[in-house]
């Protein structure tokens, strides 16, 4: 147990610990950004589908009045 603690508090171990915390922060930020991109793309997809449906319904109404 004390050997593991000595590795944590040595200069080389401290640099490794700082690097692992930095990598963890970068990975966490990438996960959050990816989640945000997926959620926002789903919202855009839904709004685009609604727009397409409204345009289609308007076109069908206009064409049904002509014939």
Swiss-Prot record:
A motif (QXSXEXXXL) lies at residues 14-22. Disruption phenotype: Deletion of the gene leads to completely nonpiliated cells. It is found in: Secreted; Cell surface; Fimbrium. The keyword Zinc-finger does not apply. The N-terminus is cleaved by the prepilin peptidase EppA, which recognizes the class III signal sequence. InterPro entries: Class3_signal_pept_motif. Contains an amino terminal motif QXSXEXXXL, which is part of a class III signal sequence. This is Minor structural pilin EpdD. It comes from Methanococcus maripaludis (strain DSM 14266 / JCM 13030 / NBRC 101832 / S2 / LL). The lineage of its organism: Archaea, Methanobacteriati, Methanobacteriota, Methanomada group, Methanococci. The gene is epdD.
């Amino acid at each position: 147990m004390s050997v593991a603690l000595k590795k944590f508090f040595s200069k080389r171990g401290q640099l490794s610990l700082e690097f692992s915390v930095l990598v963890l922060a970068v990975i966490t930020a990438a996960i959050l950004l990816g989640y945000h991109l997926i959620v926002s793309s789903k919202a855009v997809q839904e709004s685009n589908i609604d727009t397409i449906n409204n345009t289609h319904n308007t076109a069908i109404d206009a064409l049904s009045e002509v014939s």
